[in-house]
Structure formats: C-alpha cells, structure tokens
Amino acid sequence: MKLSFHGQSTIYFEGNGKKVIVDPFISGNDKCDLDEQTLDVDYIILTHGHADHFGDVVELANRNHATVIGSAELQGYLSTYHGVEDVHGMNIGGKAKFDFGSVKYVQAFHSSSFTHEDGIPVYLGMPMGLILEVEGKTIYHMGDTGLFSDMKLIAERHPVDVCFVPIGDNFTMGIDDASYAINEFVKPKISVPVHYNTFPLIEQDPQQFKDAVHEGEVQILEPGESVSF
C-alpha cells in the first residue's frame, strides 16, 4: 500500500480502487504539489474545520461528486451552505465502512471552526483523529492535537502500521511531545511527521523529530513523496 504526503496534513491514498484524500489543503498552500481543479477523488476525509484542513473540500466534492466524511456538524455546514450532496457525518468513537476500507474517529485535543469572510467563526464540531483500516493495514492520522495519554489506549485497540503525527508546535504538539507520543504511547511501525513548515509559526526541523524517535521507523516526506508498506 502507498500513502502520499502533499504538505501540511494532506494525505492521499487508494484503497480497493477508490481514491481518497485527507484534509485537502491545496489552493493557498505553497507547500502542496496538487491541483484542486484537476484532482480526481472518490472520498474526502476531514479531521476538523480549520482552513488548513477544510481547504478545498467544497471544490473537490462538488466537481467529483465525492463523498465527504467528517463530524456531523461539519457535514451539516457543507450540505446546507455549500451544496455538498454526499456527506457522511460521524463522531468520536464511531466507525463506518466504505468502499475503500473503514474509518473510525478518535479523540484529538484541539479546536474546530471555520471563519467566514466577515470574520465570524462557525463551530464545526469536535476535532478528531482518524483510524483508517485499508487493505489490511492500520493508519493513524492524528489530525491536529496536543499530547494526551489515551493515545496509548488508541494504539492498544488499533496497533498502528503508519502514524501521521503533527510536529509544528504553537497550535499542535511540538517535537518533544510528538516524539514522546510515538515512543511511549503509539509505537507504530512507521511515523511520518506532518503539520510543519507551512507557515512561520510552525517552522520545525523534522530531522530533530527523527533523531528523538526510537520506536519504529521515521520517514520524512517532501510533498509528493510516498510511504509504501
């Protein structure tokens, strides 16, 4: 199986012949190598509603007639205000099966809203992490989160093959907490650092994260590069 990284927290993969993207922050993201006007997807999965994760979901969903998976509140917002027709609302602890595999939402410590042009934020449900089971593999996309001890419980319940872990600090875990999460709680086979170097406030050296991790393998990906396992 192959998972490709496209800047910030955007991940693309194919499962059982279906094309899936997570947190499609494409336009307005100089670190992303994708083109939202030509990208072909069947499913879009969202961890929360912040602009650097919500991204181009409306354009992609409406042009591709793709199914959008996310919090119930976020799905209601997309269908009511943006005409997105195929939405699947979920919440923390819930699991659902799709053509490509299954999605289970787990806890994340963060916030979730979308700010309109008038500057007023709209509450879009709880922020969440993802447990994806695809073609016999388990992927943990942490979303945006601080460190919390139940990461250990999540990994005990779902032994992780690949973990996408935010390291940018300021808004999420930094390198110290992210490496602790991997070494002490999650212990995946492969870790991939995400959510860094997109903006000045989250500039980090991913090599420092790699040097601090002693559980499993760390793969540092440039936008467009993939991890295969």
Curated annotation (Swiss-Prot):
Record-linked InterPro entries: Metallo-B-lactamas, RibonucZ/Hydroxyglut_hydro, UPF0173, UPF0173_UPF0282_UlaG_hydrolase
UniProt keywords, alphabetically: Hydrolase
Keyword tRNA processing belongs to the record: no
Keyword Hydrolase among record annotations: yes
Gene Ontology MF terms: hydrolase activity
Pfam families xrefs: Lactamase_B_2
HAMAP family documented for this protein: UPF0173 (MF_00457)
Family, as annotated: Belongs to the UPF0173 family.
PANTHER family in UniProt: UPF0173 METAL-DEPENDENT HYDROLASE MJ1163, UPF0173 METAL-DEPENDENT HYDROLASE MJ1163-RELATED
Annotated protein name in UniProt: UPF0173 metal-dependent hydrolase SH1218
